[in-house]
Every structure is written in structure tokens, then in C-alpha cells.
Amino acid sequence: MQIGSGTNTYEWQDSWASIPESESARDGWAHHGVTVTESGQIITYHPGDPTMMVFDPDGTLVRTFPVELSDAHGITLVNEGGQELLWIADNGRKRLPGLGYDYPGGETKGQVLKMDLQGNILARLTRPHLDVYREGMYSPTWVAINEESY
């Protein structure tokens, strides 16, 4: 199957990656970010479990590491002082089977994490203290970084 259009047309490879099997992976919603390291490894989030996955270009799972996230909606890779780091936007909630496009009820815990490639948390940005978020939801979906700032 081809996806995209024009110069951005790609061949869909349905069985490219070996995703660790779990009940949550079969039923989990997956529309999270993907990034590629300087060495060509692909980093993404498990469709059901709070786990980051690192694949080689052939789709072989190289390693995983647990993360304190509901979902890794947006993943941005930066090179800071010669070290590759991840910025991950967690919208604070995860869709569940049987709810269609609705999210489960309850408080959301949106956050942005800055991590190294081993999974160590270097910074955590939580709900900003702004009037708009006092009663509203904080649900970040992507991170933009000004790499000239470091």
C-alpha cells in the first residue's frame, strides 16, 4: 500500500517492526511520535504499555525502557552539546478500546519530559500556572525546540 502523495509517497511496511506482544498492544490506540537518531535507530512508543522502543533500521527491537507517560504523542530529538536528547509531549491520557474516539474520564496529567536515550528524566514540564489552565485541560501534543539556545 502506498501512502502520501507527490514526492512524499511511501510504501507502507505493515510488518516492519517486532513490537513486544502484550494484551494492551493488541487493543491500544497508537498515534504517537517517531524519531530517528543520528546512528539511524528509530525511537517510538509502545502502543499499549508505558515503554519507549528503540529499533534498528531493519525493524529489529534493540532495546526498551520504561517511561512515566500516558502517551508519547510527540517525540522531538535534539543534539545538545554533542548528546542526543528526547523531548516527549505526553497529552496526559490514553484512548481505550470500546470508547471510540472518546477518552476515559478523570483528571489528565499532561506533561513534557526531557530524557536521555537511556530513559533518564532530565527535566519535567507540568501544567503551566496560567489562567487558561486553571480550569482547562493541559494536553501538550508536540514540542518545538530552539536549538540555538544551548
Feature map (PLM): residue ranges:
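Blade/loop signatures of beta-propeller domains
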Residues: 1-15
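Beta-strand-rich domains and repeat architectures in extracellular enzymes and scaffolds
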Residues: 14-50
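Short coil turn/linker residues within repeat-based beta-strand modules
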Residues: 10, 49, 58-61, 119, ...
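Short, solvent-exposed coil/turn segments
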Residues: 9-11, 29, 108
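Short, solvent-exposed loop/edge-beta patches enriched in aromatic
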Residues: 35-50, 56-60, 69-70, 79-83
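Hydrophobic/aromatic beta-strand positions that recur at structurally equivalent sites within the blades
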Residues: 54-55, 115
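A short beta-strand motif characteristic of beta-propeller blades
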Residues: 14-24, 60-66, 123-125, 129-133
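Asp-box/WD-like beta-propeller blade repeats and closely related beta-sheet repeat scaffolds
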Residues: 69-74, 78-150
